[in-house]
Amino acid sequence: EGLADGTIEVIATDRAPHTAEEKLRGLARSAMGIVGLECAFPLLYRYLVLPGTIPFGRLVEAMALAPRRIFGLEGGVEPGDEADFTVLDLEAEYRLDPATFRSKGRATPFAAWPVRGRAVLTVVGGRVAYDGRN
């Protein structure tokens, strides 16, 4: 509801790529946090956008445009800009599998959840940073 009505402006992830060893030290000594970056978009798209809870544009605003605006970050996709953007395959359906995460962190409560949407290309500063293979 807060995301839909604008009360919540930004969706951020806790990029906590801790190894299994760092997570298995007991509650008081374990590294806190879970992998969020690789799960966030496909989870939010599948469970908020597709059922109609929020429109796709609202998700893009909360995950990309609002953070850029709030932090005063440069970049855009106009001629002459050093573009930062990600191309998404919105039809890709799969189950989250921590073994396939590029992060060294594998801790997630969302393992095996069905999701939809996958990053297939990321451009940072006008250069390809990820092309689905690297």
Which residues are covered by each model-predicted region?
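His/Asp/Glu-enriched, well-ordered alpha-helical/loop segment
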Residues: 5, 10-11, 16-90
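C-terminal cap of metal-dependent C-N hydrolases
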Residues: 26-29, 79-134
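Aromatic-anchored helix/helix-loop segment that forms the rim or "lid"
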Residues: 1-2
